[in-house]
């Protein structure tokens, strides 16, 4: 990712409309490949991944506080979706470790969103964790439309499978 692209992204995140709400409204330029929708939450491919298969999980409601914006029940419902989507992702994309974190800021990208990022096997330790998610050190992974469509289709198919039974692992 070039410095210009990062600067453009940061400007849009800080001064533009909510990207999640715009996506939900169908605003051109805010389209994402949705892989899960239960009516209250969505999961979709990250448009700017550093790792293959990186997803975002969001509540449909515009909530800005990742803890205080939820009741305990609504927070746990969102986390069930995070778990369900991450489990499906681990079945589709080979991973050594699944990163799950909430980013965003009161200064930009305010809509609560959880990042689910599969670290592939064999990445040296020094290139893991936050380094693996950093555009400035890792760059942005470029997928063709065909590759992104194929990945989204595989994830949708996995998410349509019956729920995991007790004790079954990813």
Give names to the regions the model predicted.
Residues 1-170:
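HIT superfamily nucleotide-processing domains
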């Amino acid at each position: 990712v070039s410095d210009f692209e990062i600067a453009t992204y940061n400007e849009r995140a800080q001064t533009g409309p909510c990207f999640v709400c715009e996506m939900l409204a169908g605003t051109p330029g805010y389209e994402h490949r949705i892989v899960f929708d239960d009516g209250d939450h969505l999961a979709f491919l990250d448009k700017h991944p550093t790792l293959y298969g990186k997803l975002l999980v969001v509540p449909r409601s515009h909530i800005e506080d990742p803890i205080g914006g939820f009741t305990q029940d609504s927070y746990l419902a969102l986390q069930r979706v995070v778990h369900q989507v991450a489990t499906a992702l681990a079945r589709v994309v080979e991973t050594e470790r699944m990163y799950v974190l909430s980013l965003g800021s009161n200064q930009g990208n305010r809509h609560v969103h959880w990042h689910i990022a599969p670290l592939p096997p064999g990445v040296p330790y020094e290139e893991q964790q936050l380094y693996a998610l950093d555009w400035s050190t890792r760059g942005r992974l470029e997928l063709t439309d065909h590759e992104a469509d194929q990945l989204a289709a595989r994830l949708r198919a996995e998410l349509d499978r019956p729920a995991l039974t007790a004790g079954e692992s990813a």
